[in-house]
Amino acid sequence: MTDKTSLSYKDAGVDIDAGNALVGRIKGVVKKTRRPEVMGGLGGFGALCALPQKYREPVLVSGTDGVGTKLRLAMDLKRHDTIGIDLVAMCVNDLVVQGAEPLFFLDYYATGKLDVDTASAVISGIAEGCLQSGCSLVGGETAEMPGMYHGEDYDVAGFCVGVVEKSEIIDGSKVSDGDVLIALGSSGPHSNGYSLVRKILEVSGCDPQTTELDGKPLADHLLAPTRIYVKSVLELIEKVDVHAIAHLTGGGFWENIPRVLPDNTRAVIDESSWQWPEVFNWLQTAGNVERHEMYRTFNCGVGMIIALPAPEVDKALALLNANGENAWKIGIIKASDSEQRVVIE
């Protein structure tokens, strides 16, 4: 009788010990994100979170997202420490535009072969994003799936739940003719348009690590973490009558602003009110990208646009800039029955 080799899960490419080592590595940073409403710790089958008692009619708001092919660029450049911030930002910024306070966040990390150092760097970034937005990292899934991903390549996804008072939901229904639009400056391309970014790098033959732009490597501009606006916007909502907020993500100006506009209104954007950050000028020139396409693909230096009554503008700008935002008046809402919901002039 022939002896057969006894196979293990590790022989199949799944290292449970590495997974346990990762959990041990990240416990400390995850604990720092804990909110008082969270019950229990890491390791349970599910995460428990009570609703904050200050809400009379709490409405839960949820969102899920990834970071697109910015992740491919981060992997190629072996820079994993801020991609987790991007992941959180894409989710929590979508929640806060509806007036919601983020409560808790969960992540999904999938890879062909688990590298504990890489995964720890990514999840530490997620924890940092949670700290910046005031939400708890309550759990996640780390999936080692040999044969599904090439080597140590990985993908991440995030899921966030927040809460808003029912009477204070921001849905754009109050937007009206004469409202003023305020812009919040972005930190760069954030997490959108990176398939085009990578194509431009390929066609131009540019090495982002050696190409200098504004005194630092182009890679620093391209991998700058997505700005998290949660705390500034939540304070603004408390003190100013905000009618609508648009998060400029995939689809840029043309697709995201109309999502918060009522019928028979249009947003008129004053292009002279700001200058594009140099990274967008570089992308447009290196890729010979038409201006309309730039506004459809990238945020061009504008991370969020806020609509509010004209009398509130000065107060809003003072508050936002005092909180470290780069905020300015970017346009106005006008009555219109045109199918073109956004005009940039």
From Swiss-Prot:
<dbReference type="InterPro" id="IPR036676">
    <property type="entry name" value="PurM-like_C_sf"/>
</dbReference>
<keyword id="KW-0436">Ligase</keyword>
<comment type="similarity">
    <text>Belongs to the AIR synthase family.</text>
</comment>
<dbReference type="InterPro" id="IPR004733">
    <property type="entry name" value="PurM_cligase"/>
</dbReference>
<dbReference type="Pfam" id="PF00586">
    <property type="entry name" value="AIRS"/>
</dbReference>
<dbReference type="GO" id="GO:0005829">
    <property type="term" value="C:cytosol"/>
</dbReference>
<dbReference type="GO" id="GO:0005524">
    <property type="term" value="F:ATP binding"/>
</dbReference>
<dbReference type="GO" id="GO:0006189">
    <property type="term" value="P:'de novo' IMP biosynthetic process"/>
</dbReference>
<dbReference type="GO" id="GO:0004641">
    <property type="term" value="F:phosphoribosylformylglycinamidine cyclo-ligase activity"/>
</dbReference>
<dbReference type="InterPro" id="IPR010918">
    <property type="entry name" value="PurM-like_C_dom"/>
</dbReference>
<protein>
    <recommendedName>
        <fullName>Phosphoribosylformylglycinamidine cyclo-ligase</fullName>
        <ecNumber>6.3.3.1</ecNumber>
    </recommendedName>
</protein>
<keyword id="KW-0963">Cytoplasm</keyword>
<keyword id="KW-0547">Nucleotide-binding</keyword>
<comment type="pathway">
    <text>Purine metabolism; IMP biosynthesis via de novo pathway; 5-amino-1-(5-phospho-D-ribosyl)imidazole from N(2)-formyl-N(1)-(5-phospho-D-ribosyl)glycinamide: step 2/2.</text>
</comment>
<dbReference type="InterPro" id="IPR016188">
    <property type="entry name" value="PurM-like_N"/>
</dbReference>
<dbReference type="GO" id="GO:0004637">
    <property type="term" value="F:phosphoribosylamine-glycine ligase activity"/>
</dbReference>
<dbReference type="Pfam" id="PF02769">
    <property type="entry name" value="AIRS_C"/>
</dbReference>
<dbReference type="GO" id="GO:0046084">
    <property type="term" value="P:adenine biosynthetic process"/>
</dbReference>
<dbReference type="InterPro" id="IPR036921">
    <property type="entry name" value="PurM-like_N_sf"/>
</dbReference>
<keyword id="KW-0658">Purine biosynthesis</keyword>
<keyword id="KW-0067">ATP-binding</keyword>
